[in-house]
Amino acid sequence: GVPSYKEMGWQSGFFVNSDMAEEYGIDLSTVKTLEDYTEVLKTVKEKSTAAGESVIGVSGMSFNLTTPYESLTGTPTLPGASPVSAYGNFAGEAEVFNQYASQDYMDYCSLVRDWYNNGYLSADPVNYDSDTANRDNDFANGKLFSYVISYAPGAAEAEEAKTGHGVTFVPLLDPLFETRNAMGGLLAISSASEYPEKALEFINLLNTDEYVGTLIRHGIEGEHHTAVGDTQIDRTMGGTLDPADNGYDYTYGWQFGTPFNQKWDISYPENIEEM
């Protein structure tokens, strides 16, 4: 297969209901680590309870998403890791180690248990976190304050459009590039293809021709989007169309070729390629 040339690194953190954070007087700029987030969750618990509500502080806690290390198996939840020296964690561990036998993992478990005991998590986090539809519904309706996410540029803007309230991303670590990220998406030609040469020619066109790339990702100009300058499109067509109802664009265009050879939606930051 031909790898999809997209954002290669990953960066984890929290998607936060920024409207609620502002209402509760929470300064998210103070959050740099998981430990810092304890005070945020405490405030959410106290103020939502005082208002007669029961807002869940955070969902989706995951050691492999909140702790940087190089996964040696390609599946970060499986044992087998290597420390990344730039982050300064996993002190004293060998070049290859079991991340679940580390002090870092013990500290993580202790912290999350404290959060659970203090009522910052769902009463049944295992089942709650596995039901993403329920999570998304609660986040949209103000019953969930935040959840852990592996961030991609533009994701917060897409979440805002979906929920109808402000959404901000609070990073927990600097972006990390792993070998597995480069293999995260690819276009392959079926062994049953009658015309594999033509299929490969199309994949090449998808990766090199801006018109074709934009067409496949965003649809037909004037019907599914409008052009904004030379490098952007507007999926709302000047605010006259709900992107969810435009009949084409479903926000996963990064799967097709390279987003860096396509026009970007205006919801993305202007410096998206630099990011």
How does the language model describe each region?
Residues 1-275:
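Extracytoplasmic/secretory soluble proteins
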